[in-house]
Regions:
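Electropositive nucleic-acid engagement tracts
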Residues: 114-116, 124-127
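Active-site gating loop/helix substructures
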Residues: 126-194
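Gly/serine-rich nucleotide phosphate-binding loop at the start of the catalytic core
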Residues: 1-107, 115, 121, 281-285
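A short secondary-structure junction signal
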Residues: 118-120, 162-168, 210-214
Length: 285
């Protein structure tokens, strides 16, 4: 695959990598009738402003708009609005490839259930997906299950809207304020990140909160594996900067990247099948 070293590609295809999905990974998704579509953080902010603040405060941050809206209308209506716009979204081609690859873990700051639906739609996924939203979920047993892949939902999930202990987090900046009942999720991710490469998809590196999140996960730069940053907006200077921080940069969308991975996976399986057949022929002789 272009822009990705053979070593990191093999790490991914051999099941040693962590997939980390942001809002950009859901952008190409939509509901069956086309009424609802995946949103960026800014689009979600504008939606909340239109619904609760008469279109005002769009120049403010998502974190600020979320706090003001929750104070004005309470948490419930905000959660219901998000649920309305995400619950009917369908997995993209990119999502459908995820269950075909073995992962050390999958982490996401998205609230939607696109990954869950992708595994449900696959009749023979490589692993059994186990969702983890809070500290009360059985994290250790999931991590010790060789057939399971943990899905760490760092900012909450629309499946838990009625759980007042786990409110949806509207930005990475808010994570430190709402870590109560989520400490194990982030500590688990950081432990895994120390020994396994992370593939970041769907994050805009121009977003300061996202940069903080990435550096928080990968703070020990010189002692961790190289990571992968997939972002179609990457320019020459961005690639130079992130490369100096032990990232391999791929200027593709999430769907484009996953399609490329799927092609690499198919090539590997074809080579393996040929090798097995040749071995069988040798034994027959």
């Amino acid at each position: 695959m272009e822009h990705l070293t053979e070593y990191l590609l093999n790490q991914i295809l051999n099941g040693n990598a962590i997939l980390f999905l942001g809002a950009g990974a859901s952008l190409e998704s939509q509901s069956e009738d086309g009424k609802y579509k995946g949103m960026t953080g800014n689009q979600l902010k504008d939606l909340i402003c239109d619904e609760f603040l008469s279109g005002k405060s769009k120049n403010k941050s998502l974190s600020y708009v979320g706090a003001v809206t929750k104070d004005l209308a309470s948490t419930g209506p905000v959660h219901e609005l998000i649920n309305k716009h995400t619950s009917e979204l369908l997995p993209t081609v990119g999502h459908s490839i995820i269950p075909k690859i073995r992962w050390k873990a999958i982490a996401t700051t998205n609230y939607d259930e696109l990954v869950e639906k992708a595994y449900k739609n696959n009749s023979k996924p490589i692993q059994i997906l186990k969702r983890i939203v809070g500290d009360n979920d059985d994290i250790q047993s999931i991590l010790s299950d060789v057939n399971a892949v943990p899905l760490l939902k760092l900012h909450g999930c629309i499946s838990r809207l009625n759980d007042h202990q786990l409110p949806l987090i509207l930005s990475s900046h808010d994570y430190h304020k709402f870590r109560l009942n989520r400490n194990s999720l982030f500590s688990t991710l950081k432990e895994l990140a120390y020994n396994h490469p992370i593939v970041f998809c769907g994050y805009s590196i121009s977003d300061e909160n996202i940069r903080d999140l990435i550096f928080d996960v990968s703070e020990i730069k010189n002692e961790r594996p190289k990571y992968v940053l997939v972002d179609p907006t990457l320019e020459k200077q961005d690639i130079s900067y992130w490369s100096s921080n032990r990232f391999e940069c791929i200027p593709l969308t999430f769907v484009q990247f996953m399609k490329s991975l799927g092609e690499e996976l198919n090539d590997n399986m074809a080579k393996l099948s040929t090798a097995v057949k040749n071995t069988a022929i040798t034994f027959k002789k």
